[in-house]
Amino acid sequence: DELAGKLTAKWIKIKTAEREHRYVPDIDLSPYYVYREEESQNSVVPYTKEDFLGEVYMSEESYDTLVALLKNKKNLILQGAPGVGKTFAAKRLAYSLIGEKDDSRIEFIQFHQNYSYEDFIMGYKPQEQGFKLTNGIFYRFCMTAADHPEKDYYFIIDEINRGNMSKIFGELLMLIEKDYRGTKATLAYSSTTFSVPKNLYM
């Protein structure tokens, strides 16, 4: 019951066929990402403010306040005791602002004590032939948002208090602020410049 409404699963159907008195399993082994792609192409589920208020224990006034703050500041922190549904509410807040359940415009990560700039922005990762400069999850998501300026994107960080913000964000810590969106900074591991797009909300 605790997982109701939180997980979406695509079950693999298993059928059996009788042959020479033996049962041979006929198993659909299509990769999960194929199902995910089919679902994203064939089913667009609308999601409204009313849907949010029906799923999240929050008043309409509080919802309107959250929306106004997020649109104005670009960044929003939800604070509360563990297990009260902050992450659940954050994702559905994003859904309601997008207007549909479009997970391609939402990214979710969880910070921990060992999370680093190399994981988040950019860094060298071990490969078979040595080390390779690899883009982190925040960098990639920002690039996606920058390529589609007509759409809003939402980056959700769970357990943000467990991470070392200065260590993880590095020179980009200031760039997530509203007044510095679009301002370019040179990345530590490359000579390229980078900015946090204005259509990305955190």
Give each language-model segment a name.
Residues 35-202:
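AAA+ P-loop NTPase catalytic core and its hallmark functional loops
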Residues 3-49:
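Contiguous surface segments at macromolecular interaction interfaces
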